[in-house]
């Protein structure tokens, strides 16, 4: 395939990535330039698929959204057989070839998006964790693979951090997800704390609800701490010095979202906590020092 076409496809993915707000850095300047393009390609692949599952601009039934995801899966298959034509998949095809990315990790992301279409309630925390295994954990593993790191212990610690990041996003986005008729707070926890779906829809900001979110935040903080050892493990990898800074910045960003939730006394029904520019600069300083 022509190098100019591959380069323009990577640029397309970069432009798409930079248009979207995220809590956490996506291929920041801490990532070496030669690695950054691969992260842009993976992000663009996942971002588009996520839009199929979520965005209101797509008309039609659940079946229509699932059909779009199946079509995306077909294009993923094509990129593994050298038949990619879409800019995202041209860039992704180069990425999976250069970084030896197993298709199963990318398919896991698509399975999470399918689940978003099919499922809107979770009976218990284990169900939520199972969702995170597809929606979040592959991302950390993909980043490690881009840096040519294949280590089961590191993968395990990365999974802890990625799950925690996904959970932090859930508690941050309770208000947003309700608009999509989606609740990630485990139903058995809601029963335990005396909170119903109706309470959430009516934005009933009770002490019971705040205690419920406090409980979710505390269990998420434990996962962040359990994954923190990844940074020490990575210090033994000469090729990952800058990656450590990137991952630590991401880790701090997730922790800061939880701090923002605490600062509003867990009232995520009325307010969506968000990192501002000052917060991000502060986190960068913490990462470097």
Task: Label every model-predicted segment.
Residues 1-166, 171, 175-289:
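Catalytic cores of Mg2+-dependent Asp-rich isoprenoid enzymes
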């Amino acid at each position: 395939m022509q190098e100019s076409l591959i380069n323009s496809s990577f640029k397309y993915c970069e432009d798409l990535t930079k248009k979207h707000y995220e809590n956490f850095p996506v291929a920041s300047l801490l990532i070496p330039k030669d690695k950054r393009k691969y992260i842009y390609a993976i992000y663009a692949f996942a971002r588009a698929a996520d839009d199929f599952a979520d965005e209101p601009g797509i008309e039609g039934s659940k079946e229509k959204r699932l059909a779009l995801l199946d079509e995306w899966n077909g294009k993923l298959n094509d990129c593994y057989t050298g038949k990619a034509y879409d800019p995202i998949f041209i860039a992704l095809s180069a990425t999976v070839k250069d970084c030896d990315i197993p298709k199963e990790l990318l398919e896991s992301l698509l399975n999470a998006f399918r689940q978003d279409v099919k499922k809107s309630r979770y009976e218990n925390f284990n169900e939520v964790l199972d969702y995170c295994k597809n929606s979040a954990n592959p991302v950390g593993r993909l980043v490690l693979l881009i840096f040519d790191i294949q280590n089961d212990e590191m993968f395990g610690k990365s999974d802890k951090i990625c799950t925690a990041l996904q959970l932090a996003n859930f508690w941050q986005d309770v208000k947003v997800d309700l608009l999509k008729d989606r609740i990630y707070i485990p139903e058995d926890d809601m029963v335990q704390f005396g909170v119903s779906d109706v309470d959430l829809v009516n934005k009933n900001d009770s002490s019971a609800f705040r205690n419920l979110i406090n409980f979710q935040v505390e269990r998420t903080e434990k996962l962040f701490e359990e994954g923190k050892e990844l940074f020490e493990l990575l210090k033994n990898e000469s090729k990952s010095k800058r990656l450590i800074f990137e991952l630590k910045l991401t880790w701090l960003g997730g922790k800061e979202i939880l701090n923002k939730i605490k600062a509003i006394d867990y009232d995520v029904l009325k307010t969506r906590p968000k990192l501002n520019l000052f917060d991000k600069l502060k986190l960068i300083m913490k990462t470097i020092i």
